[in-house]
């Protein structure tokens, strides 16, 4: 029984090791002498002009979060739409519940004024 799921453990270990190897190699093999130029702020290859720290309005964050939520919705809808003929009525009901929950969240955001641009 445990051997059937061994590939998940191997996949997890590989998923941890794969990004760590280049990071550890860069740490040990890379130069350790930061110069003032390396510590300077980089802005598209040009000298930084004005204040480097710019505060963004929270509305950008809310719009980005709403975009990600509804983008993930499309990721879930696409495979369902492709396999709809094979999975039947239960999948239709499950997806309808999923969409009702997401639309309910959108209506809640709208009523709270999160989508109003100020």
Swiss-Prot record:
InterPro entries for this protein: NAD(P)H_OxRDtase_bac/plastid, NADH_UbQ/plastoQ_OxRdtase_su3, NDAH_ubi_oxred_su3_sf
Enzyme class: translocase
Compartments where found: Cell membrane
Enzyme Commission (EC) number: 7.1.1.-
Segments crossing the lipid bilayer: 6-26, 62-82, 87-107
Covalent S-S links between cysteines: none
GO cellular component: NADH dehydrogenase complex; plasma membrane
Catalytic activity: a quinone + NADH + 5 H(+)(in) = a quinol + NAD(+) + 4 H(+)(out)
GO MF annotations in UniProt: NADH dehydrogenase (ubiquinone) activity; NADH:ubiquinone reductase (non-electrogenic) activity; quinone binding
Keywords: Cell membrane, Membrane, NAD, Quinone, Translocase, Transmembrane, Transmembrane helix, Transport, Ubiquinone
Bilayer topology term: Multi-pass membrane protein
Function of the molecule: NDH-1 shuttles electrons from NADH, via FMN and iron-sulfur (Fe-S) centers, to quinones in the respiratory chain. The immediate electron acceptor for the enzyme in this species is believed to be ubiquinone. Couples the redox reaction to proton translocation (for every two electrons transferred, four hydrogen ions are translocated across the cytoplasmic membrane), and thus conserves the redox energy in a proton gradient.
Quaternary structure and partners: NDH-1 is composed of 14 different subunits. Subunits NuoA, H, J, K, L, M, N constitute the membrane sector of the complex.
Homology family: Belongs to the complex I subunit 3 family.
The protein's name in its UniProt record: NADH-quinone oxidoreductase subunit A
